[in-house]
């Protein structure tokens, strides 16, 4: 939809299995296949920060007429993909020890499994902070913003459950309760008519993935019949310019 609306769209993948059709017909960089030699790639995978490498150059190669409309970059993380949580973090970013260092989780003490998972969460924090720093560095050029939503949670041994994927009706909250993080630069707030006080007041509001599609369309002012303002979490915090 964003591509059809004229935006320059770029999909960056750092997870095996690809985008499963979601990124068809848009420019895509598959870091799993590239595995560019360096400290951010080892053995058969790369750490998520690799998606920030060469990003300016990748964006510059997108069509100029689309870049003039706006740039949207999707980053598909490896994140906390299990069961080998320990592989998701560089050695220097492991604040929780000891951690489970095998994908056979039943061989580890539960706290070791939790530590390995928590290390992956801490590294995602670092990745998001680095992405926001990159965006802040481009505020004179663009009006940047960031939305982060996890696709699922994870069971770490509670009630003998591991990983995720139980039917929604039976899945515990650990598999269903995920974070949604929004960061808007001042230029983006002004351009979009967003009231920061209104947004902060919504911080504790329960959301679902159903809100994501409509919220992105609203933020980017995409006019389409499929847009539902009732599912746009920013709609009542936005004043038309």
Predicted regions and their residues:
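Catalytic domains that recognize anionic headgroups
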Residues: 1-241
């Amino acid at each position: 939809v964003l591509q059809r609306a004229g935006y320059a769209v770029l999909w960056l993948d750092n997870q095996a299995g690809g985008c499963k059709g979601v990124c068809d017909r848009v420019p895509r960089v598959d870091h799993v296949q590239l595995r560019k030699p360096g400290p951010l790639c080892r053995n058969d995978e790369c750490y998520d920060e690799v998606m920030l490498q060469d990003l300016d150059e990748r964006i510059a190669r997108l069509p100029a007429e689309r870049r003039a409309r706006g740039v949207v970059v999707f980053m598909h993380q490896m994140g906390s993909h299990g069961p080998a949580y320990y592989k998701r973090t560089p050695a220097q970013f492991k604040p929780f020890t000891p951690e489970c260092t095998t994908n056979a989780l039943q061989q580890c003490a539960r706290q070791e499994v939790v530590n390995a998972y928590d290390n992956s969460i801490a590294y995602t924090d670092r990745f998001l902070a680095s992405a926001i720093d990159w965006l802040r560095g481009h505020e004179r050029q663009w009006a940047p913003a960031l939305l982060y939503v996890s696709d699922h949670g994870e069971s770490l041994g509670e009630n003998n459950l591991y990983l995720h994927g139980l039917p929604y009706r039976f899945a515990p909250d650990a598999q269903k309760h995920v974070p949604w993080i929004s960061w808007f630069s001042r230029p983006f707030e002004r351009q979009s008519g967003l009231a920061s006080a209104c947004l902060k007041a919504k911080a504790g509001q329960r959301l679902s993935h159903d809100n994501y599609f409509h919220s992105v369309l609203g933020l980017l002012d995409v006019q389409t019949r499929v847009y539902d303002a009732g599912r746009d979490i920013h709609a009542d915090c936005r004043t038309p310019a």
